[in-house]
Amino acid sequence: MNPNQKIITIGSVSLTIATICFLMQIAILVTTVTLHFKQYECDSPANNQVMPCEPISIERNITEIVYLTNTTIEKEICPKLVEYRNWSKPQCKITGFAPFSKDNSIRLSAGGDIWVTREPYVSCDPRKCYQFALGQGTTLENKHSNDTIHDRTPHRTLLMNELGVPFHLGTRQVCIAWSSSSCHDGKAWLHVCVTGYDKNATASFIYDGRLVDSIGSWSQNILRTQESECVCINGTCTVVMTDGSASGRADTKILFIEEGKIVHISPLSGSAQHVEECSCYPRYPGVRCICRDNWKGSNRPVVDINVKDYSIDSSYVCSGLVGDTPRKNDRSSSSYCRNPNNEKGIHGVKGWAFDDGNDVWMGRTISEDSRSGYETFKVIGGWSTPNSKLQINRQVIVDSANRSGYSGIFSVEGKSCINRCFYVELIRGREQETRVWWTSNSIVVFCGTSGTYGTGSWPDGADINLMPI
């Protein structure tokens, strides 16, 4: 091979190698770009459509490392499509309740900027639990906290934090509200927020952070809602709302909401005479609520909601050990399932109960006349047998020497069953404690357990003499 041929051969080989390297670099670039954009798509096997991966739908981040020569590519694998909650699992079998959370808001207010609140409640999305309360537009160590005993002002807002995090200055104000309810349908939060004049209030329906619908007062007498979580089944959320007299006949309606839009309104039917401040829980395929009769009964009304056909029925808890305050003593009290007992029916307090076969679990103040102390127990036959009074598994949550307040239920879905939990509002300040000018609360939370448990008392615990006036 002469020198010219050698040069041509070497040149050809070099050109071939350069071409191959160039093509490899193009392939690497194409692969990189493809994988980069591919991470923002999910293939839905059900309808073979390409669905965008929204950040709110990502349950966990999984990183896959792919090596191509010296290039490292990070690819986020798309999670399964988020679905509506259906709450079809059975209710957990429990022996009682175990301590879960306590926020100590009043004690912390003695040395920090903590919101003045009342009407707290708890609700959970599929991953976390959150605490809510109606703020008074002020912190406790602030002169605006004077006279915060009043329920309805334009400054009240719905506050939301992770459970166990007190309502500090960085707390999110979800909406304007002096009455509220919240629930998560599996995809996003729904907040029902009532505010405005007593005779012409507005309920706003906020879904996924956006105002979707609203409704005005229908009886011009303090439109109000649950002050605890609503319930969503297969994308339909139900909320109980009342407008009318707090000590006489009122107009209660059950609203059915889908992604924030009111799709149906059903009037209350059945034998319940007065219904407000309901504590609701999923009882697949429907929703069941235990409410407050502020007119005729110290036994609690039951509202059963059929989510499929929008029908409503109502009655009263059968247990002769009744749940409202004020009430007669346990020897004298009664309940016969269908009607109010006409025993100290005027006034009352928000509370809860839930059925367990023929039995009923319930909570109530220890005092028969005031919001002091708190206890839970099970009544054998209390769901099905009129005036049943056999009590078992009693627990003291707050001893009788300390104040309590509202209480309500929330549900938590586990791997195999749905657990029932409750919170107790621990009110401090006015009217009873006149050294200070404010009224606020902390909370304590318990959940059902199938295990064993001990005893104790979990009051608010703040020394009123150490608190700002």
Swiss-Prot record:
Organism: Influenza A virus (strain A/Victoria/3/1975 H3N2)
CDD domains: Influenza_NA
Entry GO MF terms: exo-alpha-sialidase activity; metal ion binding
Reported function: Catalyzes the removal of terminal sialic acid residues from viral and cellular glycoconjugates. Cleaves off the terminal sialic acids on the glycosylated HA during virus budding to facilitate virus release. Additionally helps virus spread through the circulation by further removing sialic acids from the cell surface. These cleavages prevent self-aggregation and ensure the efficient spread of the progeny virus from cell to cell. Otherwise, infection would be limited to one round of replication.
Highest taxon of source: Viruses
Positions of region (Head of neuraminidase): 91-469
Gene Ontology biological process terms, A to Z: carbohydrate metabolic process; viral budding from plasma membrane
Name used for this protein in its record: Neuraminidase
The protein's Enzyme Commission number: 3.2.1.18
Keyword Cell division: no
Residues the entry annotates as binding substrate: R118, R152, E276, E277, R292, R371
SUPFAM superfamilies: Sialidases
Regulation: Inhibited by the neuraminidase inhibitors zanamivir (Relenza) and oseltamivir (Tamiflu). These drugs interfere with the release of progeny virus from infected cells and are effective against all influenza strains. Resistance to neuraminidase inhibitors is quite rare.
